[in-house]
């Protein structure tokens, strides 16, 4: 009787493990779904880490109580290798070679002036000045909140070329500060009340390079929504509430992803068209407001390399407020560039985002 009960229990647990893997796979490849057609299904990527962790707990259980069963979660990770690596990559440590340029993308939360000050004592301004980056792309960067008489000359000395866009409108303010000449710039047009993307054409060591700075549509989750998501992830919410709140969260997420998808498509089309017509390389960065398991990420990954996936390590959470930890800030590059040592720098906490950094080396013979 005891053996039968044990066998039955192990089969039930094995079945639950298989079900977890199936859900993990479905969510992991949900980025292939066009949000315009199925917005709810395309929004479930936010829940991917939950099933990633559940499968890990199954692995621990099997190792402790029936080691042969460990094959189930291990096979699960193998078949879900692509989304798992996209979400939490691991790479050999790489040292940026001589001649590599350093790119920094940072949603600066309008420089968090309440906590950081308005002058050179502002922690975010100080971080940028001491970053050593060659190209700095900022989102939510309303410069007028700073003491520009004090800050502007110092920024100009470190970064002689810059463009600040959107400071005098209701839209987000995007900025670029760079050591390279800016040949021209233009806005990539798409529908949005406040978000935007800008294309800059830089002269990097005699070659024209397209740099695109993005701040795509926000998910518009309030503090209560974020607290509930945190409770779902931590498992402190009862099952009935989990179902109810998950549906409500998915409703908000699906509304945002439906707006965001055509924005990403416009940017992807712009980059592809420009590269074909002008034969130039591209660097794309910004706050995507989407996780690595998303249509936005999948669309831009079709013709570009995610620098963090290619050279970073760990989940690289770039948003870190209100109990939500997700990687929504990105740096991508075209095939002419090789990324090195991408990282999300969690040492500066003034903004609700951490900056993402990567070194890029121009390849002499791209594939």
Q: Can you annotate each of these PLM segments?
A:
Residues 105-121, 143, 220-256:
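Acidic/histidine-rich helix-loop elements
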Residues 27, 73, 77-98, 115-116, ...:
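Structured beta-strand-rich core segments of catalytic domains in phosphoester-bond hydrolases
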């Amino acid at each position: 009787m005891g053996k039968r009960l044990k066998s039955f229990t192990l089969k039930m647990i094995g079945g639950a493990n298989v079900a977890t893997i199936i859900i993990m796979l479905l969510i992991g490849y949900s980025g292939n779904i066009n949000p315009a057609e199925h917005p709810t299904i395309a929004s479930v990527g936010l829940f991917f880490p939950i099933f990633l962790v559940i499968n890990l707990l199954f692995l621990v259980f099997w190792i402790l109580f029936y080691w042969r069963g460990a094959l189930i979660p291990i096979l699960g990770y193998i078949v879900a290798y692509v989304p798992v690596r996209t979400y939490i990559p691991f790479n050999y440590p790489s040292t940026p070679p001589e001649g590599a340029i350093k790119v920094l993308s940072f949603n600066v939360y309008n420089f968090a002036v309440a906590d950081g000050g308005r002058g050179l004592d502002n922690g975010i301004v100080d971080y940028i000045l001491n970053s050593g980056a060659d190209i700095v792309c900022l989102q939510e960067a309303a410069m007028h909140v700073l003491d520009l008489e004090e800050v502007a000359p110092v920024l100009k000395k470190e970064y002689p070329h810059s463009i600040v866009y959107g400071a005098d409108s209701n839209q987000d303010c995007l900025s670029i500060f760079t050591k390279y000449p800016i040949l021209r710039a233009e806005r990539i047009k798409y529908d949005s009340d406040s978000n935007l993307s800008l294309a800059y054409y830089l002269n990097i060591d005699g070659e024209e390079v397209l740099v695109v700075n993005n701040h795509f549509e926000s998910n518009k989750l309030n503090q209560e929504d974020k607290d509930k998501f945190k409770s779902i992830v931590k498992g402190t919410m009862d099952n009935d509430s989990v179902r109810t709140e998950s549906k409500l969260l998915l409703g908000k997420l699906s509304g945002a992803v439906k707006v965001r998808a055509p924005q990403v498509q416009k940017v992807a089309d712009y980059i592809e068209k420009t590269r074909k017509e002008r034969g130039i390389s591209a660097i794309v960065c910004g706050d995507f407001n989407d996780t690595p398991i998303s249509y936005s990420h999948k669309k831009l990954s079709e013709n570009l390399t995610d620098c963090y996936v290619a050279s970073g390590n760990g989940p690289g959470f770039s948003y870190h407020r209100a109990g939500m930890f997700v990687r929504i800030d990105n740096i991508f590059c075209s095939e002419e560039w090789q990324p090195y040592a991408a990282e999300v720098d969690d040492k500066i906490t003034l903004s609700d985002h951490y900056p993402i950094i990567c070194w890029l080396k121009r390849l002499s013979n791209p594939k």
